[in-house]
């Protein structure tokens, strides 16, 4: 069974399948880093609270596989409204992955998943 990459940008959802974990992470990186201005958000107000662009998730990419029933890999990345990217492990309980100095977020994801 292949790895599945799911990209969510607003109401739009796209899914791609990849045979290798390395290819799936590469696809996730390309799709999320090429969003450019579409990922930017302005400060929003809701009732009495204000949400800065860094507090808003403008796009989410999820990686799972190789099986659908009990996938061995569940990870992903959030693109924040200020353009920053945060990678994580898990699906329901997301645990952020620490990015070491001089390391890009997707390099940290590759290191953590062993790809």
Regions flagged by a language model, labelled:
Residues 37-115:
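Short, mixed-charge low-complexity intrinsically disordered segments
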Residues 11-23:
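A short, exposed loop/beta-hairpin motif centered on an aromatic-Gly-Thr core
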Residues 1-13:
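Short aromatic-glycine-(Arg/Gly/Cys) micro-motifs in beta-strand/loop hairpins
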């Amino acid at each position: 069974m292949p790895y599945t990459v799911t990209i969510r940008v607003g109401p739009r959802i796209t899914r791609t399948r990849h045979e290798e974990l390395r290819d799936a992470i590469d696809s996730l990186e390309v799709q999320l880093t090429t969003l450019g201005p579409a990922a930017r958000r302005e400060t929003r107000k809701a009732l009495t609270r204000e949400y800065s662009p860094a507090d808003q998730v403008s796009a989410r990419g999820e990686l799972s596989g190789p099986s659908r029933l009990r996938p061995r890999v569940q990870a992903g990345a959030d693109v924040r409204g200020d353009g920053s990217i945060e990678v994580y492990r898990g699906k329901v309980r997301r645990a952020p992955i620490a990015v070491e100095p001089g390391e890009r977020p997707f390099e940290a994801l590759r290191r953590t998943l062993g790809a």
